[in-house]
Amino acid sequence: MTSSAPVGVFDSGLGGISVVRQIRTDLPHERILYFGDSANAPYGTKTPEQVRDLSFRIVEDFVEQGAKAVVIACNTATSSAVQELREHYDIPIIGMEPALKVACDRGHGERQSVIVAATPLTLRERKFAALMHRFEDAHTIHKQPCPRLVEIVERGELDDHDLVMRTLHDYFDQYDLAHTDSVVLGCTHFVFYRDYFRELLPNNVAIVDGNEGTARHLEVVLESLGKLAPEEQDGGVILRNSDPGERIAELAQQLLER
């Protein structure tokens, strides 16, 4: 497999396009195949077995298209499927997890109060429980499932300011935000809400996501294998979705260019 081969990126729907944008910024010569599984969204309310089955189908398709690596741009699919995918395929499988370590490290040893916003399944899975166990003794960590934030993106309602702010208040008004240090956006869909979160949260509260770290991890892995795209290659993105409707295709393109 050559360095000019594409990178496959997938998500339960449209949220992973936020990761594609980061990869395109950091690795502009890479060719990216994006698959959004909007016909089966959301993953966050499915069983781990269902998510694993869907993930294997998608990765198998990427392999058939000659992908040199796959990025699971979905915290939920990472939690449910990444280990088995790595055992089954001989190409790099890059996963994601909520950037809890980044949020806790911001305190430089001081106790941090952190809210992790994610899908219900991500927060229930053993992978997140193990991650949380590493930090919960030294920090105050709140888990906040936010399934409606996924639905708003998938319905194309991201620009409905009143709806979004009302939804955020429903989820976060229960917290003492003035004494919160960070909110972790533990779902790639949620990165599209960054400006809304900034409006909701006091200025001292950091908003943390895992997209930069994921793109950086991909770069390190490809470089170690000698598989970074050649600089003379024109990068690009091909968007595909399990929902064949024109509306989804238009929405995906809008999010890519947002």
UniProtKB/Swiss-Prot annotation:
> Top-level EC class, please?
isomerase
Q: Which reaction does it catalyse?
A: L-glutamate = D-glutamate
- The active site consists of 74 (proton donor/acceptor), 187 (proton donor/acceptor)
Positions bound to substrate: 11-12, 43-44, 75-76, 188-189
InterPro entries listed in its UniProt record: Asp/Glu/hydantoin_racemase, Asp/Glu_race, Asp/Glu_racemase_AS_1, Glu_race
* EC number of this enzyme: 5.1.1.3
Where is coiled-coil annotated? Answer: none
Q: In which pathway does it act?
A: Cell wall biogenesis; peptidoglycan biosynthesis
Query: What UniProt keywords are attached to this protein's entry?
Result: Cell shape, Cell wall biogenesis/degradation, Isomerase, Peptidoglycan synthesis
| Molecular-function annotations in GO | glutamate racemase activity
What does the UniProt function comment say about this protein? Provides the (R)-glutamate required for cell wall biosynthesis.
What PANTHER family does the record tag this protein with? GLUTAMATE RACEMASE (PTHR21198:SF3)
Q: State what protein this is by name.
A: Glutamate racemase
What organism does the record attribute this protein to?
Answer: Bifidobacterium animalis subsp. lactis (strain AD011)
State the encoding gene.
murI
